[in-house]
Amino acid sequence: MSEKRIEQWEVERYWEIFSSLSNGQPRLNNAQAATVLRNSRLRDEQLEKVWDLADVDGDGELDFEEFCVAMRLIFDLVNGELSEVPPSLPDWLVPESKAHLVQATQALSGREPQFERVEEDDDTPGLKDGFDWYMSPSDKGKYEEIYSANKNHRGELAFSSLQDLYESLSVPDTDIRSAWNLVNPSASSTINKDAALAFLHILNNRHEGYRIPRTIPASLRSSFESNKIDYQLDNVRTAKRWGVDNDTDTSTGRKAKFGDAYLSRLGIGGRTSYKPQGTDFSNTIQDEEWEKVRLRRELAELEKKLAAANTAAEDRKNGRTVAGGPNWALIKKEALQMLEYKERELRELREGTGRVKEGENLERLREDVNTVGEQIEGLRVHLAKRNEVLAVLRRQIEEEKRNR
């Protein structure tokens, strides 16, 4: 079982890069990610393959989980951990929230991994007949402990997620795979809860010296094949606690009770978040984090605009010019002076007096006067709009303060 994973410090570093590029949005497009990807100096065809692998949902953009996948692939290529871009994502690098998409893609492309069907050896010495499908409450509680510790976010169990358990059992690898094939008739990469409990029950009995059955009761098989997914994870019953009684010795008196050492090593006293396969981002960047980023950015912008508006209003009140902006009072004054001057020239032209030069075009002066009048009207409209914007900003800030 691979021990590779994306470490927490890597996730935090990737988050800093991602948030600086995304402008508060939950996804990066190709243009936004191009700069940081090309800084790796990998060949364009390599970057294209990395993008295609990381874009698990195929929407042409990278969310944060997919961005982490892309960055880790790039770093492994740059550091020599990988000589070329792999044809598919390794299991440890697949985000758990998108594992079902990868499995569906593999199934459609015919690459779904399947175990070779292993014929049972009826002549295995020392094994007993009489396998019983009945699960005692204590055994079932223990199975649910193990299932809860290793299920993914969709309530399903992968074969490789129980590798540590397999190593703690006195069960050959061929028998473990035979039991998996028995409860997984569709050869899927994961099984549902009913199949998982049956799988653990088979392993328990094999650990106690019973032969693995050849068939499964029809009622159980139908529940395995339907493979209905319960997305309401809160509906999954809490695993029952179990203890070790004085009569918990195995039939041999020497073996450890099924799963005891494994559960003790996990430190399970009930439901746990232990997930040994894949990359789980559930405890890193949540949707609430995105909302916080957006709200902080919006609040900072609103506060900045309010401060600027208050400063401008105070400057206008005191007759000062707003730094970095036009002095509308001065512009208005100059425009009125220009209008007065043009009106005076027009009046002198009509009366034939004053300094009006011979041959000046009366129509030209009229156009100038009209232009100045339009400019003044435009300034008035603009001032009214800016006052409306200021009022809207103040209302938004008051709403933000009330919502805090």
UniProtKB/Swiss-Prot annotation:
<feature type="domain" description="EH 1">
    <location>
        <begin position="10"/>
        <end position="100"/>
    </location>
</feature>
<keyword id="KW-0254">Endocytosis</keyword>
<feature type="domain" description="EF-hand">
    <location>
        <begin position="42"/>
        <end position="77"/>
    </location>
</feature>
<keyword id="KW-0479">Metal-binding</keyword>
<dbReference type="GO" id="GO:0005509">
    <property type="term" value="F:calcium ion binding"/>
</dbReference>
<dbReference type="InterPro" id="IPR000261">
    <property type="entry name" value="EH_dom"/>
</dbReference>
<dbReference type="Pfam" id="PF12763">
    <property type="entry name" value="EH"/>
</dbReference>
<keyword id="KW-0963">Cytoplasm</keyword>
<feature type="binding site">
    <location>
        <position position="61"/>
    </location>
    <ligand>
        <name>Ca(2+)</name>
    </ligand>
</feature>
<comment type="similarity">
    <text>Belongs to the END3 family.</text>
</comment>
<dbReference type="GO" id="GO:0003779">
    <property type="term" value="F:actin binding"/>
</dbReference>
<feature type="binding site">
    <location>
        <position position="57"/>
    </location>
    <ligand>
        <name>Ca(2+)</name>
    </ligand>
</feature>
<dbReference type="Pfam" id="PF12761">
    <property type="entry name" value="End3"/>
</dbReference>
<protein>
    <recommendedName>
        <fullName>Actin cytoskeleton-regulatory complex protein END3</fullName>
    </recommendedName>
</protein>
<comment type="function">
    <text>Component of the PAN1 actin cytoskeleton-regulatory complex required for the internalization of endosomes during actin-coupled endocytosis. The complex links the site of endocytosis to the cell membrane-associated actin cytoskeleton. Mediates uptake of external molecules and vacuolar degradation of plasma membrane proteins. Plays a role in the proper organization of the cell membrane-associated actin cytoskeleton and promotes its destabilization.</text>
</comment>
<feature type="binding site">
    <location>
        <position position="66"/>
    </location>
    <ligand>
        <name>Ca(2+)</name>
    </ligand>
</feature>
<keyword id="KW-0106">Calcium</keyword>
<feature type="domain" description="EH 2">
    <location>
        <begin position="139"/>
        <end position="227"/>
    </location>
</feature>
<feature type="binding site">
    <location>
        <position position="55"/>
    </location>
    <ligand>
        <name>Ca(2+)</name>
    </ligand>
</feature>
<dbReference type="GO" id="GO:0006897">
    <property type="term" value="P:endocytosis"/>
</dbReference>
<dbReference type="GO" id="GO:0007015">
    <property type="term" value="P:actin filament organization"/>
</dbReference>
<keyword id="KW-0175">Coiled coil</keyword>
<dbReference type="InterPro" id="IPR002048">
    <property type="entry name" value="EF_hand_dom"/>
</dbReference>
<keyword id="KW-0967">Endosome</keyword>
<keyword id="KW-1003">Cell membrane</keyword>
<keyword id="KW-0677">Repeat</keyword>
<dbReference type="InterPro" id="IPR025604">
    <property type="entry name" value="End3"/>
</dbReference>
<feature type="coiled-coil region">
    <location>
        <begin position="280"/>
        <end position="404"/>
    </location>
</feature>
<dbReference type="GO" id="GO:0030479">
    <property type="term" value="C:actin cortical patch"/>
</dbReference>
<feature type="binding site">
    <location>
        <position position="59"/>
    </location>
    <ligand>
        <name>Ca(2+)</name>
    </ligand>
</feature>
<dbReference type="GO" id="GO:0016197">
    <property type="term" value="P:endosomal transport"/>
</dbReference>
<comment type="subunit">
    <text>Component of the PAN1 actin cytoskeleton-regulatory complex.</text>
</comment>
<keyword id="KW-0472">Membrane</keyword>
<keyword id="KW-0206">Cytoskeleton</keyword>
<dbReference type="InterPro" id="IPR018247">
    <property type="entry name" value="EF_Hand_1_Ca_BS"/>
</dbReference>
<dbReference type="GO" id="GO:0005886">
    <property type="term" value="C:plasma membrane"/>
</dbReference>
<keyword id="KW-0009">Actin-binding</keyword>
<dbReference type="InterPro" id="IPR011992">
    <property type="entry name" value="EF-hand-dom_pair"/>
</dbReference>
<dbReference type="GO" id="GO:0010008">
    <property type="term" value="C:endosome membrane"/>
</dbReference>
